[in-house]
Amino acid sequence: MDITKLEQKNKCIFAIKLAEKASSYLQESNVKGLINEAIEVSWKWVHTEENLGEVLYNFLDNEENGFTLFQEMEKDEKNISAWDCIIDAVAYVSRAAYEKEGVKYLPEPIEIVDDNIFTHMVQSLILCDSMECEYIEKV
């Protein structure tokens, strides 16, 4: 399947589903709650298209509990790959939300997000477990 040919909303749904799957590799409870919250906000944006770009971005780049900080502290390669997938997915939905809002100036990390991120997102999930290829094909 060529993900880049999907409509924007369907690309976001695909990204969220990969993030949900990747989150199963991260067991720490306080982190799991934040990931679930980010996924819920992502789904909310897909269903409502409310102005949630900034809210989603704050899950990624937050001085106290940003996903990028948690990833930097991670030692386990599988967990780092899971974080890669989750961060990519939230960044993609954040970009879509910002664009829908008509925001002219995006945060620098979001500015570089485009459809090429799907290759990295998929590879990251497969690095968690090669059996995830089957899941990805079903999505």
Description of each model-found segment:
Residues D2-V139:
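Structured binding/interaction patches within domain cores
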